[in-house]
């Protein structure tokens, strides 16, 4: 197997590493995360701007909130880059003076034999390219002025990287994977899990969708024995409907039916990019509905609540009153997926079904509405000023949030789901109520209906 080199992006916070990473990864989403909660702040993705294959890695968070206590963190993260990378891109903000963190990272990188290219970011105008200034004193000969915000300098970077990759024997990308015959990039299908308790109307919903004249469909067995994957094309976008309906295990006991239904739903939820939670509103929201909704929340999946059999729900009342009562029930009983919009349908009559894919498209579009690192930190700091965290029970200690960043797991390759990583004094002090407060603030500033807001808190000791 041919060696695919790794290129590490290092630098202190707020110099533009995330923007550079996204440009190189060909993504307009926040940084792709390899293994959330396991790999600390190392993020990776294939590089899209080069002709030769390589992987880019971001060691985000080096020296967040400078203090004497972070010297070891700087060294540890730089060590990760040195031990795993074939080339290091050291990012600096060309508009700022060198900081102690910049100097510390440079000192550590100079001790290695790994080649380093200085990326002098935020050079939005050509006149900024003329003055290398104090950056020349870092001891690295190779440098590129660029602007991640405007795309300046990336052609030069790609050319420089391809020259290096050729020397390292990196294969051309076409040698690794076959290009589509028509030369066009094929859109990734969005996997949609249709889940819910038995008799909620999942089969009727899928049948109503497949009667749409815009469909191109053939049934093939799914990767599990308890689901059917149904390819479906809607307005040029491919989907895969993961249909758990019609696969009800034979059972003489309703309790067994409930258990097996939940098992099938859980498998479908894990595979899906977005879930359609089908509720029989005429029968009311049940414990089984709440259980399946809980799995969706635990898996951190985008979701739409399909309020089915709406035509049978208080049919003599006005639609406005019925919708108000449905919303009250859904928000009360399924509060833990409050981020999920709901759609009232009658699947048997195919009413409301046409709205589903419009909402999915809107969720996918607005899922990219993510704050930058700077915007996120300003929002978090303002939220703390407006409503400071309370003291822990039986203690005078209070939560302190030092720094925050955003990561997106690569398994969310069609609808990105952000994970907001909070670096705090003690993660045990982050209460559910304060987490919900921060979620609400993020949703107010960066609305993304259908997308969960997930926090990952990490304790950091500061000597200040």
From Swiss-Prot:
Annotated Pfam families: KH_dom-like, MMR_HSR1
SUPFAM superfamilies: P-loop containing nucleoside triphosphate hydrolases (SSF52540)
Keywords, comma-separated and alphabetical: GTP-binding, Nucleotide-binding, Repeat, Ribosome biogenesis
KH-like domain sequence ranges: 369-461
Domain of life of the source: Bacteria
One GO MF term attached to the UniProt entry: GTP binding
CDD domains: EngA1, EngA2
InterPro entries assigned to the protein according to its UniProt record, in alphabetical order: G_ENGA, GTP-bd, GTPase_Der, KH_dom-like, KH_dom-like_a/b, P-loop_NTPase, Small_GTP-bd
GO biological process: ribosome biogenesis
Gene3D superfamilies for this protein: 3.30.300.20, P-loop containing nucleotide triphosphate hydrolases
Binding residues for GTP 2: 196-203, 243-247, 308-311
Keyword GTP-binding attached: yes
Functional note: GTPase that plays an essential role in the late steps of ribosome biogenesis.
Family indicated by similarity: Belongs to the TRAFAC class TrmE-Era-EngA-EngB-Septin-like GTPase superfamily. EngA (Der) GTPase family.
Assembly, per entry: Associates with the 50S ribosomal subunit.
Protein name: GTPase Der
Biological source species: Akkermansia muciniphila (strain ATCC BAA-835 / DSM 22959 / JCM 33894 / BCRC 81048 / CCUG 64013 / CIP 107961 / Muc)
């Amino acid at each position: 197997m041919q060696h695919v080199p790794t290129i590490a992006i290092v630098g202190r916070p707020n110099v533009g590493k995330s923007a550079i990473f996204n440009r190189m990864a060909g993504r307009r989403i926040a940084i792709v995360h390899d293994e959330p909660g396991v790999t600390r702040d190392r993020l990776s993705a294939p590089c899209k701007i080069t002709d030769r294959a390589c992987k880019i890695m971001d060691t985000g968070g080096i020296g967040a909130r400078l203090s004497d206590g972070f010297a070891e963190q700087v060294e540890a993260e730089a060590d990760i880059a040195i031990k795993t990378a074939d080339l290091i891109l050291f990012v600096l903000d060309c508009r700022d003076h060198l900081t102690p963190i910049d100097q510390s990272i440079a000192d550590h990188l100079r001790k290695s034999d790994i080649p380093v290219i200085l990326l002098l970011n935020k050079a939005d105008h050509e006149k900024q390219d003329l003055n290398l200034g104090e950056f020349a004193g870092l001891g690295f000969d190779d440098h590129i002025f660029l602007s991640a915000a405007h795309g300046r300098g990336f052609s030069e970077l790609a050319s420089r990287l391809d020259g290096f990759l050729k020397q390292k024997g990196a294969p051309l990308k076409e040698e690794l994977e076959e290009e589509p015959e028509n030369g066009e990039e094929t859109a990734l299908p969005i996997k949609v899990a249709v889940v819910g308790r038995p008799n909620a109307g999942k089969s009727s919903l899928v049948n109503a969708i497949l009667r749409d004249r815009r469909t191109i469909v053939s049934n093939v067995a799914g990767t599990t024995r308890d689901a059917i994957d149904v390819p479906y094309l809607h307005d040029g976008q491919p989907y895969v409907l993961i249909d758990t309906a019609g696969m009800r295990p034979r059972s003489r006991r309703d309790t067994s039916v409930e258990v097996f239904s939940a098992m099938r739903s859980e498998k479908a939820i894990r595979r899906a990019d977005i879930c359609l939670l089908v509720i029989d509103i005429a029968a009311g929201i049940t414990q089984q509905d709440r259980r399946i909704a809980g799995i969706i929340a635990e898996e951190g999946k985008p979701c739409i609540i399909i309020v089915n059999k709406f035509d049978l729900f208080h049919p003599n009342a006005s639609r406005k009153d019925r919708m108000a009562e449905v919303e009250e029930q859904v928000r009360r009983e399924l509060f833990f997926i409050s981020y999920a919009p709901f759609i009232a349908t009658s699947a048997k009559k195919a009413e409301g079904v046409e709205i589903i894919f419009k909402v999915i498209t809107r969720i996918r579009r607005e899922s990219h509405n993510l704050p930058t690192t700077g915007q996120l930190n300003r929002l978090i700091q303002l939220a703390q000023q407006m409503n400071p965290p309370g003291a822990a029970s039986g203690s005078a200690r209070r939560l302190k949030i030092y720094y925050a960043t955003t990561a997106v797991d690569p398994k969310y390759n069609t609808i990105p789901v952000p994970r907001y990583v909070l670096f705090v004094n003690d993660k045990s002090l982050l209460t559910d109520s304060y987490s919900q407060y921060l979620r609400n603030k993020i949703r107010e500033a960066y609305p993304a209906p259908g997308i969960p807001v997930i926090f990952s808190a990490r304790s950091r000791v500061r000597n200040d």
